[in-house]
Each structure stands twice: as structure tokens, then as C-alpha cells.
Amino acid sequence: MATGLTPPPQPIKRPPKAVTWIIGIIALLVLVTPLTVGFYTDWLWFGEVDYRGVFSTVIVTRIILFIVFALLAGFVTWLAGYFTIRLRPDDLTAFDAESPVFQYRQMIENSLRRILIIVPIFVGLLGGLVGQRSWQTVQLFLNREPFGVEDQQFGMDYGFYAFTLPMLRLITSSLSTLLVVAFIIALVGHYLLGGIRPGNQMTGQKAFISRGARAQLAVTAGLWMLVRVATYWLERYDLLTRENATFTGAGYTDINAHLPAKIILMVISIIVAVAFFSAIFLRDLRIPGLAVVLLVLSSVVVGAVWPLMLERFSVQPNRAEKESEYISRNIESTRFAYGITDDEVTYIENWGAGGATNAEVAADEATISNIRLLDPQILSPTFTQQQQLRNFYGFPEQLAMDRYEVDGELRDFVVAARELDPNSLQQNQQDWINRHTVYTHGNGFIAAQANQVDEVARDVGSTRGGYPVYTVSDLQTNARAAESEDAEELGIMVEQPRIYYGPLIASAADGKDYAIVGDTGDGPVEYDTDSTSYTYDGEGGVGIGNLFNRAAFALRYQEMNMILSDRVGSESKILFERDPRTRVEKVAPWLTTDSKSYPAVIDGSIKWIVDGYTTLSSLPYATRTSLTEATLDSVVVDNFQQPLLTEEVGYIRNSVKAVVDAYDGTVELYEFDSEDPVLKAWRGVFPDVVQPESEISNELRDHLRYPEDMFKVQREMLSRYHVEDAGTFFTNDAFWSVPNDPTAPEGRQEMKQPPYYVVAADPDTGESSFQLITPFRGLQREFLSAHMTASSDPDNFGKITVRVLPTGAVTQGPKQAQDAMMSSDQVAQDQTLWRGSNDLFNGNLLTLPVGGGEILYVEPIYSQRRDQESAFPKLLRMLVFYKGQVGYAPTIAEALSQVGIDPAAAQDIEVVEEDGTVTVPDVNATEDADATTDGEDETPAAPAAPAGSEAEGIEAINEALRNLEAARDGSFEEYGRALDALDRAVESYQGAGTAE
């Protein structure tokens, strides 16, 4: 019979202590193991590259800072809690028995000892984790160097702003944060322990604060106000990096309103601090309360209202005059910050005012003979198809430019390393053993002279002509000495062509770019050639012969095969972190690296050259810029290149040249700006890491390039800061802008035109020089305003020359030249006809100063068969624009002739025919081609009419089109012959129309 009684609830059983401990240990291992494994494997890696001192310095610095900040944060927290407990009231009779404080006081009392331990430990750990991240700030302060340049307002050396001020900010912000934490602990603690009682009007209960609580809170608030005094003092210096509408730095309002306001607020803050301290002895809290009100009102009136009124009624009506002095400061500081002072940049004013004759242009052999036909942005598929050898080899999406001497003449080359592409491995090649122990390395260095093709491609459908002429040094060609003669002549004969390190090798989609190499006792297993295998014997790699190291890397990469596979033996090593940029950034964590590394053959070895930058976030009056935004252009977007870190800088120097060996991964850092105080400071932090500039070999120096990202940042600054007069700067009248890229694919034509590496005449000597060039257009105008070039030659490396065009003359800019070339009747007709079965690509539009006074635009046109997986781009036509005339022909010599330039110098551009002989384009043929003109009286002679009437030409085209349609279902060879026939029919028709 039911009684209606409910059985008492069963108490929840706690798990045994052993289970709790096991769960806790497992959770701890899950958190700690990845950190420990990462730490240990990184320690091994730094030992491999012989930079363990860097690793140790960083780790020791971080540990010390962690301890210091943890102890400081923990001590302040403990002290606040300790005094809160000591000063708590013993008598709670004044409290309502129903109040939360009264009910929970006993429970809190029982936990005080535990709270006083746990809370400081937690805050201390948090403070240590935050503080250790500031290791660079602390090390730079300890190893600070003077700049020898003072700011224009306070007369402080720039080194104070670069090294000391960040440290002072770190100290004040840390103290301020800890005092806020201490205040909160005291406030909450005294409330919970009965030291603070809020009033209750409904019950008539008055607010109450104990003497101990009042004293503790007053002291904490007073100390915070003293820290605030120091903060106001430091904020005076921050005014010099303030962003204004027109410029960076303190302006008239800042100097005459904000700066005095900081001093006034400092004095008031001292008064407020004294008022808080007085509350220790005085029961009346109105004194500190009134002091706080005074500070708030002063902050509003002195810190906001007064500067606003001064700006509105004094500065705005006379801004040009009022801000003139401060704009001049901004110009001077920004030029220094970005290395574009008058000592480093040469301006050639009114360049080209007198023009140049066609004869003078033709005589500019250093430029004309080096006109670039090959575009490294477009030719990667061509390199891949013609030089890939195997599916697992590859080339980067954008190839690199370098220079070598050919028969005593400097020539630019498109260069690339044939790397292993892990993303191209297919089917069983992706098996763990094959991927990580067989397909481990690339093979060879490929170079193609940029002003040379194998054969003239006169027909769009032809399978011959328009392709690079390769100079190759790899395992196969090295085995055939006769085929390596060209490589030896150019100095690119590679003694060790195997490539274990490179950006493409490190591009694995899953991030596992490692290779396991070394003798396993079963003979060579790495793929080398179709008939040979190889065993790596270089210095690179971390030994994983012992089980402990194998287990560590198995955990790092979550791969049990490292422990279980027979391919890992006692002599095995693991190669990882194989991207040259990554290796440089790890051994020099204070460097920002250029977004592009490029290969060069140095002393018989393939080396990756990486440019390293020292940067600062700000300098007084120096304009800041975003590295990502400044370096973004149509090429970077098109290639999905990894951009620089999204950081803003106010100072940058190319202070370090880094070299990474493609075979063994050795990293070498060379000083390249001995005057850079930031580099000097970092050399103090990491002694002997950066080698002196004198250690750079002549062969390496011959292949150093002016860094592209640095150049982009400088051109962005020069577009405005070439202006010296503050009044002109204020009106923006003389500003330039980087032109958009008119040759970019659709959707990217609003992106900036990239700079280009070319061999051209040196602005001073007229001799051939390897340069990085870019044009400037007027602000919001398409006409050309200036042309900037930076030399990469060892004798005058880094010299920047800006040719400033006369303002009274009008010179077409890149977009106008592109529009004129594309709207030419012949170009438009050909492109309309060809696009039916081909993809056409506009190559780099080069803006070349020629003859000491004229601008020549050159652009290659590439074609690629559509709907064919094996198709790849080839050079089809050359476009030139000169003095309003358009030249358009299969060869550069013919195109130059059409615009009235004697192509004799261009004859040095060799064309390698099918039989292997080297010939020169028939210059006389250029006299048989018509020029498309735009308001020019001077035109080449009209060509003789080809055979056949216009009607016959139309009939021939129609017949060719019918044959082409019929050949669509046939073989590629039949289709190609039909396209060739169509091209010949079109040329015949065009020739007939020209003759008429």
C-alpha cells in the first residue's frame, strides 16, 4: 500500500580522487604536449641552421619577462587582496540579516586563504603571458642606438622615439592596468566583506564605507593618478605621430592647444592624486570627488573644447599659412624615414623638354638592344610545359628576373628553379613513402634571355616560334658537357642542381612540406632521374635516427609512419621549414621579409636571395603607410601571392640581404645598411648573427636586386613627397600617382601597375644597367608626369633617379598609350579574328625613357590555343608606341621601324631558328610594313602590294574559315594547319588593302 511519502534524494557521489587526478593529468598533457613538442623540435631546427643563439636569446628573454610580469602582477593582486582582508570590519551588526553580505560572509571567510592564493596566481600567469610578448620592446631598449637626427619640436633624438618611448609606454600601461585590477579587487572585496555598504532609501539605510576600505581605495586611486601624470607627459611625444587630414605630426592646433592641455592636465592630475591621498586622513570624500570633477571638466574644456575652437576659428580660415611650418617638418621627416632624401634621390627636372630625334633614340643602344620580349608574369605555363620534365616538378606562378653577361654585354634573363611541386603529385605518388622519402627535391636552374625567342611566330595557329630559348643547368645537361657550354659561359653552371629548399616545395596544401632523407641501408631511394636514385648527403636536416626525435616529429606532424616505417633509419634526417622566407624570418624574427625570393647561381650553387627590412611603427612627423596596401598591385593580386604582414610602418630600411642555399638550407644574413640604427640595435641583441657587408662576395653582389616591395613603398611616398614647398604640398597641385595597370585582366585594371626589372641605359652614364622602373602620372590625370628608376648595379646600388617631365608639355601616359595601341585598326582586326580560337594576353607595358628625351612604350602580345590542356603562351606580336605612332609586328625590329626608329640596335636581339642557327630579323622587312599613326606627319614608306586582289583575299579567307570549321573534329595537327592557312589568308587580304 502506497504511503505517499517521497524517498529522500540520494547524494551525488563524487568521483574518486584517482579519477579526478587522471582527468586533470590528461587535460594538462593535451595542453602542454603540443607546446613542448613545438619547443623541442624548434630547438633542434635552430641547432641545424646554427642559429641556436637566436632561439636561446628569445626564449630566455621571454622567460625573464614572464617571471617579472607574473611576479609583479601576482604581487600587486596579492597585496590588494591582503589589505582587503586585513582591513575588513569585524562587526556586521549594522547589516541587515537578509542582506547577501551577511548571509555569505561566513562562507567567504572560510575561503579567504584559498582566494588569496588562487586569484594572484591566475592574474600573475595572465600578466606573465601578456608581458612576455613585449620581448622585442625590452631588447631594443636595452640595446638602443642614437639616430643622430632630432625631432623638430622637442629636440629629442629619434632613438628616443624608436627605443625608449615604447619601453616607457609599456611600463606606464602595465602599472595602470595593475592598479585598475587592484582597485577592482579592493572594491569588490570590501563590499563582500562588509567594508562597503550601499544605501537603501526604502529601508532608510545609509551608505557606509569603513576607514580601511576608504584608505585602501584612496591610495590605489592616488597611485593610478600619479601613473596618469606620467602618461600625460608621454602623450606629449605622441602628438608628433598624430594623423592629421593633410599630413602626419603635430600641427598648429596640437602645438598651441593640445600640448599645453597635456601640461595643464598633468598639474590637475597631481592635485587629484593629493586629494585622494588626503582621503586617508579625512572622512570627507567630497574633496577627492571634487578633484575628479575638476579633472573631468578640465579634460573636456582644455583637452577638447579649446582645441576645437582654435581649429575652427583660427586654423581653418588660414590653414595653409598656419600649417606651413608643420607640413615642412612632415616632408623632411618622411623623406628620411623612407630613404628618399635629396642625398638618395636625384631629380632630373624638365627631362625631355628638348625632345630627342629618331636618330638619337636609335642610338640609345643600351635600352633599344635590351627591350624585353619575355614577360615573367605570363610565361610560367610555358616554362612548365617545356621544362617541367616530370609532373611532380613545377615553377612558381610568377617567374623572376635577373641579369647575366652575354658576350660582354649585360642582358636580363627570366630565371626559375625547377622545384618539386607537392601539389602536383598524382595517385600513388601521394603515398606517404613516395611523397616524403622518394619525391624529395627539384632539379636544376632554368634561364631564358628576355630579349630572345626561338623563332619568329608570324601565324597565330603555328606550333612553332615565339618561345623562350632556355639555358639549363640540371642533372641531365650537366651529364652532357657539350650541352652545358651556354651555362658555363653565362656563369650559371650549377655544381649541385638538386633543390631541397624553395617556396614551391614548401607550398603543400596540407602544410606538410617535410622530406625524410639519408641512408637507410637499402641504397638510394630518392628520385633523381629516370635511371638514377639519390641519397641526400648535405648538412641540412635534423637527425631523427633515435626514437625520441622520431616520436617528437611524429607528434608534430601527427604521422605514425615516422615511427613505424623502415624508410626511417639511424642515419635519417628530416628537412622541414623549407620556404626560404620562413627560414629567414625564424632566424631573424625582427626582420620583415620581401614578398618575393628569387634564385641565383652563386659560386656554382643555387641560392635563394631574400631581402630583409628593418621597420619601426612610427617616427616623429613621418607619414605611416600600410605595407600591404603599398605593395598591392595587379600582379600580386593575379598571382595570389602571400602579401606582407598587414602592418603600418613609419620607417623602413633594406638593411639585410639573406641567402638560403637551395641544397642544404644554410641561411646567411649580410648587413646591407651599416648606418641603420635599428639594425645596430638588433645586432646588439643578437651578436654575430648578421655578417658585415664586406663578407658579401662579388658574385653574390652581382645578383642582388633593388627590392621590389621597398621600391613600391618608396614610389608611393615619392608620389607626394617629391614636393618640397609646403604651400604646394597643401594644395596637392603637384602630386603624382602610380598609374593603374591597363594590361591587367578584366576586373583588375583598377589595380596599380607593378614596377618592372629591365636592363636599360643608366641615367648618368648611358651604359647598360639593371634597373627597377615605374612611371608616374599626374594626380587624377592620365598624362605622364615622371619616371622613377632604382639601380641594382653593384657600383651604384640603390641610387634612385626621377626624371620629371616638363609641366608645359603633354606626354601620353600608360593608359593612353595602351588605348592607342589597342584601338589601332590592324590590332583590333587581328584580335577580333584571333580571339575566336585563342586566348590573348597583354604582356608587361614597359615605359622606357630613350634618347635622352623621349618615351617609348613596349608591350608584347602572347597567344595560347583555347580548349587545349597542353597549350601554353607564346610571343605572337610586339606593340610599340612612340610620338603618337603605333608599331605592330611579329618582331621588335619591325615594330620599331614602323614608328620611325632605325632598328639597327635591336638587331642584337637574336632569334634562334629551328635548325639551331642564330639569325637576326630582316630589318628591310620593316620597311614593308605600314605604321599606324596618330597625328604624325612622319610615317614609313608604304609597302608593296602583295599578289591577289581584295575580292580574291575575301574568298581566300572564307575558304580558310570553312576548312577551319571542318578541321575542328580532326587532329590537333590538322586544326593547326587550318589555322595557319587562315592566318596567311588574312595577311594576304590585309596586304592587298594596304596597297590599295
Swiss-Prot record:
Belongs to the UPF0182 family. It comes from Corynebacterium efficiens (strain DSM 44549 / YS-314 / AJ 12310 / JCM 11189 / NBRC 100395). GO terms for cellular component: extracellular region; plasma membrane. Residues 940-950 have a biased composition (Low complexity). Its main location: membrane. Disulfide bonds: none annotated. This is UPF0182 protein CE0802. InterPro entries: UPF0182. Residues 925-939 have a biased composition (Acidic residues). Keywords: Cell membrane, Membrane, Transmembrane, Transmembrane helix. It is found in: Cell membrane. The keyword Cell membrane applies. The lineage of its organism: Bacteria, Bacillati, Actinomycetota, Actinomycetes, Mycobacteriales. It is a multi-pass membrane protein. The keyword Cell membrane applies. Residues 920-950 are annotated as: Disordered. The chain crosses the membrane at residues 19-39, 63-83, 115-135, 176-196, 212-234, 262-282, 290-310.
